[in-house]
Curated annotation (Swiss-Prot):
Nucleotidyltransferase involved in the post-translational modification of proteins. It can catalyze the addition of adenosine monophosphate (AMP) or uridine monophosphate (UMP) to a protein, resulting in modifications known as AMPylation and UMPylation. This is Protein nucleotidyltransferase YdiU. It is an enzyme of class 2 (transferase). Its cofactor is Mg(2+); Mn(2+).
Length: 488
């Protein structure tokens, strides 16, 4: 046990107030020679840590699972999940929650070690993680944070000095993940599947207290909980769609109750606009394709509603009706959020009847001409319509006239419209080929400079600076189709 607390550890463990069926207490498995390869300074400070102290050997031992900070209470969480539509009892198979850091601002964040060794939920897995996928999660989660999309974050990555065996021998690593909590739709499915209404109620009460305290005194608090989660997920999925983010594995165990994006295994950002885009090697049917994400979110939330039925109303028929009514509201909430976001991407302040068709026409043309999603909006923002099949087409020129005329009709100036576009159209995203380039250099050569440079550029996606331009270039046709793989 590490007693020295100059690093700033301030751990609580409220999750252990839940019935013990929700977790198993287990220590991390030590590793041979841990080395800190990445520390998130700004996140460390916001959590109340001293970054310089975190670089010391005693703290690196904590990130590796070789020691525990004062107040730690390591545990693996139990949950269930529909994985590609099939229900399984699951749990943290390679991660441990070591505690909840209480920040100087009075907020509570889970501190989880990912890749910390086997747990009772490992299901024949080795409980370990490889360096590449852990660095990938660090890069993408930080890019999402910079894009202002709710997300779990990465505090540190350490190498273990031990190999991890997947298809080949890979260097092992442990990621320290930070989240508002790790309560998932699958956590509620787990409680419901066990058949204890008391446990289900305990989980719902704990979740409300932790994430939605404003509804604690609500007359129908469990219905209100469902409403709040639906609202947050509608907003989250709209934000994904607006930047072209494809999660890749929207199983119910990867849908958080807090409304944060979690699990960056097979995710990627879309290059050419195509509703059918899939990157994940295991998503052979396209279940989680870009255009399907809103529908899959609604499906996942319906599983949450099902799990809550025993506590929504004492009459089962009435409870079922409440669940169905609430789930039916998701699509309208999502559409509203997405439409509002799309209007901002096109500099539209006011509401006009033609806006829907203006947006639809542009997306249809982008799909037809295989236009780069991010760069199309970037070019419209900068008003630099370089020679591309889309911009050279007569139909785009016609659309452009309509759009310009629509901008002129507004009370707001064109300058203000373009400024709003700039704040809503990222100049840079973590392009798949650039992320791979950074990972290749780090994993094979121990060269982290490529990753550092990429992270620096991704930190201000709406800045439109010249040093970002090299990262705006789409991949060469030879780099497509890009495939992602689950780290496990």
């Amino acid at each position: 046990m590490t007693k020295n607390n100059e690093a700033g550890w301030n751990l609580d463990h409220s999750y252990t107030t839940l019935p013990q069926s929700f977790y198993t207490e287990i220590p991390p498995t030590p590793v041979s020679s841990p080395e800190l390869v990445k520390l998130n300074h700004s996140l460390a400070i916001s959590l109340g840590f001293n970054p310089e102290e975190l670089k010391k050997e005693a703290e690196i031992a904590i990130f590796a699972g070789n020691a525990l900070p004062e107040g730690a209470h390591p545990l693996a969480q139990a949950y269930a999940g529909h994985q590609f539509g099939h229900f399984n009892m699951l749990g943290d198979g390679r991660a441990l929650l070591i505690g909840e850091q209480m920040t100087p601002a009075g907020k509570r964040f889970d501190i989880q070690l990912k890749g910390s060794g086997p747990t009772p939920y490992s299901r024949r897995g080795d409980g370990r993680a490889a360096l590449g996928p852990m660095l990938r999660e660090y890069i993408i989660s930080e890019a999402m944070y910079a894009l202002d999309i709710p997300t779990t974050r990465s505090l540190a990555v350490v190498t273990t000095g031990e190999p991890t065996y997947r298809e080949t021998k890979l260097p092992g690593a442990i990621l320290t993940r930070v989240a508002s909590s790790h309560i998932r739709v699958g956590t509620f499915q787990y409680a419901a599947a066990r058949g204890s209404i008391e446990d289900l109620q305990s989980l719902a009460d704990y979740t409300i207290k932790r994430h939605y305290p404003e509804i604690e005194d609500h007359e129908n608090r469990y219905t209100a909980l469902l409403q709040e989660v639906i609202k947050r997920q509608a907003s989250l999925i709209a934000k994904w769609q607006l930047v072209g983010f494809i999660h890749g594995v929207m199983n119910t165990d990867n849908i958080t109750i807090s409304g944060e994006t979690i699990d960056y295994g097979p995710c990627a950002f879309m290059d050419n606009y195509d509703q059918g885009t899939v990157f994940s090697s295991i998503d052979t049917q396209g279940r989680y394709a870009y255009g399907n994400q809103p529908y899959m979110a609604a499906w996942d939330l319906a599983r949450l509603a099902e799990s809550l039925i025993p506590i929504l109303h004492e009459d089962e028929e009435e409870a079922l009706k409440i669940a169905q009514d609430e789930i039916s509201k998701f699509s309208v909430q999502y559409e509203n959020q997405w439409f509002l976001g799309m209007k901002k991407k096109l500099g539209l302040f006011s509401n006009e009847e033609q806006d829907q068709s203006l947006i639809e026409q542009l997306l249809k043309m982008m799909e037809k001409f295989k236009a780069d999603y991010t760069n199309t909006f970037r070019s419209l923002t900068l008003n630099t319509l370089e020679n591309t099949p889309l911009f050279d087409s007569p139909e785009f020129k016609e659309w452009y006239k309509l759009w310009q005329s629509r901008l002129e009709k507004q009370d707001e100036s064109k300058e203000n419209a373009y400024e709003m576009m700039k704040n809503n159209n990222p100049s840079i995203i973590p392009r798949n080929h650039r992320v791979e380039e950074a990972l290749e250099a780090a994993v094979t050569s121990g060269d982290y400079s490529v990753m550092e440079k990429l992270l620096e550029a991704l930190a201000n996606p709406y800045a439109y600076t010249t040093d970002q331009e090299e990262y705006c270039v789409p991949p060469a046709p030879t780099n497509r189709p890009y495939r992602t793989f689950c780290g496990t």
